[in-house]
């Protein structure tokens, strides 16, 4: 009886020790994630407090032991500051952050609105929320193209999507 009781306690001890081991290993990942998230929030607050006029969409993920930062921004200073702060905290990562304007625009980073009133959307879809409108001849900055939609920035700095029928890339 005494042997069984000790044996059972041993199994419980091993089980609890294993659980703590897994939790402690997971905390390292969470610590990096918390640090990256905190730095990301600081950068957003400093450089991109209004997502209607500044784009800083970076995501954190892990693949095995590798930290991956993926996303896009139209703010080179914000991305540089973000990378510098992470380096200062000794966080190493695979950099998949794309700076806009996108390189696949082949130099066509300016455009003109070509219809009397272009509806500018929050997402690249006709059913998306109407963000603002632009009138014929309005010059815009083209940041990227996705299917038949262009992500643009208007002269008043608003970011929005316009379909290809409403813009002429220059």
What annotation goes with each model-predicted range?
Residues 76, 80-104, 125, 153-170:
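Boundary regions of SH3-family modules and the immediately adjacent low-complexity/disordered segments
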Residues 26-28:
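Bacterial signal peptide processing site
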Residues 30-63, 118:
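Gly/Ser-centered flexible loop/linker motifs
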Residues 66-68, 72, 79, 133-164:
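SH3/SH3-like beta-barrel superfamily modules
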Residues 1-8:
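N-terminal secretory signal peptides that target proteins for export/translocation
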Residues 21-24:
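C-terminal motif of bacterial Sec signal peptides marking the signal peptidase cleavage site
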Residues 8-16:
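Sec-dependent signal peptide recognition
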Residues 113-140:
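Beta-loop motif signature
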